[in-house]
Amino acid sequence: MIAEKIKLFDTYIHKIKFEDVTALTIEKINKREKVSIGYVNPHIVRLISSDRKLESALNKIDYLHADGFGMKVASKLLLKKDSIEPLNWTDHCIEYLRFCEKNNWRIFFLGSTDNILHKTIDSIKSHIPKLQISGHLNGFNQLNEESIDIINKSNANILWIGMGSPKQEIWLSENIDELNINVAQCVGDV
């Protein structure tokens, strides 16, 4: 999939919608290829201005979508046109997980604390009982050399990384080449 991208602040943002993310997921899983997806919101824009490591990490992510209404306003003010439709992942996460369930894809959750992860997974299982959750890891004190091995052995198709910015983007950019998954997606704090 080729998506138009626009330069806004110190990074590029792809003009993608939820339907593009689902199409990209289907494509990469069917072709057994890998893709990374992240987002840019006003908080990340502020961080980029003083964090070159984050800027470099964002440049390594295949697709960055605009997150939140603030990015739409910024594009209108700075670029003088409605260039971006924001894709707020919290509006689509349940729909995406149901999409994964329907296709029998396996998902791995990386991020947050053990307590929050267990509560999140229990809630997801109560609403989407047939979703194949292939594993989870604490994103704060369980990240070590074995983490990649655990994720890879889970046979997950999709990895959701919810560690907040800039940690999740930097972790993804440093580890994407070692991951045996099809879709790696930064989803914010869990």
Model-derived segments and spans:
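N-terminal nucleotide/polyanion-binding subdomain common to many enzyme families
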Residues: 1-87
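Structural motif
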Residues: 37-39, 65, 158-162, 185
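Short glycine-rich anion-binding loops that position phosphate/pyrophosphate groups of nucleotides
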Residues: 41-45, 163-168, 190
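Conserved acidic residues
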Residues: 62, 107, 134, 157, ...
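Conserved beta-alpha
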Residues: 71-150, 154
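Short Gly/Thr/Asp-enriched flexible loops that form oxyanion-binding sites at enzyme active sites
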Residues: 121, 169-178
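Short, flexible loop segments at boundaries between secondary-structure elements
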Residues: 139-143, 181-190
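Proline-aspartate-enriched helix->loop->beta-strand connector
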Residues: 151, 155-165, 181
